[in-house]
Amino acid sequence: MRLAGVTLAAVLGLAGTAARADDLTGQQRFLCSASHATICYADGECDSGPAWSWDVPQFIEVDLENKRLSTTKASGESRTTPILNLQRESGHIVLQGYENKRAFSFLIDEKTGWVTVAIARKDVAVSVFGACTPKTSAP
């Protein structure tokens, strides 16, 4: 299996276990976790499996008010990525950004909390499926 050095923008390659999604209607802060990721290379080779296979954070904190994605304090990683484009429309939350030569896009179903993430960098594409739940405690 080829590893891609997927950064926080690859973000949601989070937990290897199934997560439970929740209603995010009106929420500004939530926690996301992923259950499955697929990474494909320009040569046509693809790898697929649990998100933890790529050694990425187990959880990602999403802060819409401050437009940022962060690892949790418990991860010990202290990584933050800015959200450059944020839209809430037709029951969806769309987050997009670009950092370290990687572009990312999240599509979150606001009612169910289910999330699909796409990450792209030169010759590599990653897709991640997961779930988000409201975050009620302070950062």
How would you label these PLM feature ranges?
Residues G5-A15:
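Bacterial N-terminal signal peptides
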Residues T17-A21:
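Sec/Tat signal peptide C-region and signal peptidase I cleavage site
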Residues A37, N66-T72, V115-V117:
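Short polybasic amphipathic segments
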Residues Q58-I60, A103-I108, G130-P134:
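Hydrophobic/aromatic beta-strand elements that line small-molecule binding cavities or substrate pockets
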Residues F106-L107, T116-S127:
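Short, exposed beta-strand-loop hairpins at the edges of beta-sheets
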Residues D123-P139:
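C-terminal partner/receptor-binding element of secreted or periplasmic proteins
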